[in-house]
Structures are given as structure tokens and as C-alpha cells.
């Protein structure tokens, strides 16, 4: 029998603004507590990360500000699109994230939603905010790297 290839987790949505506005210090994988209609909407890709962030309340982590559009064929069991959703993390991970946010002034942002072995996972990042000056430096550095790669390809 042939070996099965490992599939890379398929992405549902990316938070492109997070990569632009923040510098990631550390990333983690978290599960989400979702309702059935939310899962069906996510399978269709009906999600918006625009104002999403992670909030800590009473020893739990909550995903706030993410919009999962209502599922078309749901009927009366429709979910609320903008409700806060609980993140599934170990207690020590929550404590570590919460302490680093309070002490170092970092923030926790959602980066990517994806399927992993049939479950929906959220990649979150402990991040430091970038100011306009840092973003411009990053763009310059990327342009220089692209130009050098182009010149090396010509030789």
C-alpha cells in the first residue's frame, strides 16, 4: 500500500492586517467553541477578521470582534454573527499570555483560521505593535531583498 501524504492544514481565512500592523513574538494554536451553523459558514469562508482581538476574562480567553456571517440554510437555529467565542487553551497557556500582555504591553491577535484533522483551529500571536516608521523600514527591506533575488536570478 502507498503511504498517505500528510495534508497541510487548509486555511479558511487570514488576518492580513495583523501581519502589517504587528510584529509577532510568539504564535500558538487554539481551538474554538463554535455552534453548528458557525462551522458551516466557516466552511463557506464567510468570516471577517477586521477588528478581531483576544480578551481575557476570569481565567478564560475570548475571541472578540470577529464576524462569522449567518448560514443561509439555518432556519430558526441561527447563530449571532458578532458574539464573543471562547478559545480552548490550557490554563498555563492562558496565564502565560495574560501575564505577558499585562507586563510587557504586548497584545494577542488572531492570525489565521484553518482546519486541522476536521477541527477548526485559530492561530493566535503574541504581538508588538508597529508604528509607521517600522512599517516603512520593513517595506524597504522587502524591496531590497526582492531586487537582489531578481538580480541573482539574471546571472
Swiss-Prot record:
One of its GO terms (cellular component) is cytosol. SUPFAM superfamilies: Small protein B (SmpB). It holds the Pfam family SmpB. Belongs to the SmpB family. It is found in: Cytoplasm. This is SsrA-binding protein. Required for rescue of stalled ribosomes mediated by trans-translation. Binds to transfer-messenger RNA (tmRNA), required for stable association of tmRNA with ribosomes. tmRNA and SmpB together mimic tRNA shape, replacing the anticodon stem-loop with SmpB. tmRNA is encoded by the ssrA gene; the 2 termini fold to resemble tRNA(Ala) and it encodes a 'tag peptide', a short internal open reading frame. During trans-translation Ala-aminoacylated tmRNA acts like a tRNA, entering the A-site of stalled ribosomes, displacing the stalled mRNA. Keywords: Cytoplasm, RNA-binding. Its main location: cytoplasm.
Amino acid at each position: 500500500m502507498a503511504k498517505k501524504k500528510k495534508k497541510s492544514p487548509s486555511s479558511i481565512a487570514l488576518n492580513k492586517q495583523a501581519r502589517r500592523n504587528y510584529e509577532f513574538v510568539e504564535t500558538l494554536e487554539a481551538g474554538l467553541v463554535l455552534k453548528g451553523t458557525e462551522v458551516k459558514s466557516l466552511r463557506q469562508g464567510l468570516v471577517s477578521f477586521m477588528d478581531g482581538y483576544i480578551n481575557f476574562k476570569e481565567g478564560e480567553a475570548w475571541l472578540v470582534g470577529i464576524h462569522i456571517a449567518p448560514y443561509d440554510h439555518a432556519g430558526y437555529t441561527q447563530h449571532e454573527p458578532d458574539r464573543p467565542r471562547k478559545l480552548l487553551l490550557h490554563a498555563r497557556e492562558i496565564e502565560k499570555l495574560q501575564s505577558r500582555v499585562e507586563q510587557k504591553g504586548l497584545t494577542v491577535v488572531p492570525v489565521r483560521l484553518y482546519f486541522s484533522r476536521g477541527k477548526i483551529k485559530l492561530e493566535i500571536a503574541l504581538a508588538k505593535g508597529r508604528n509607521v516608521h517600522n512599517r516603512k523600514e520593513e517595506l524597504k527591506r522587502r524591496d531590497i531583498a526582492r531586487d537582489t533575488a531578481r538580480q541573482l536570478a539574471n546571472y
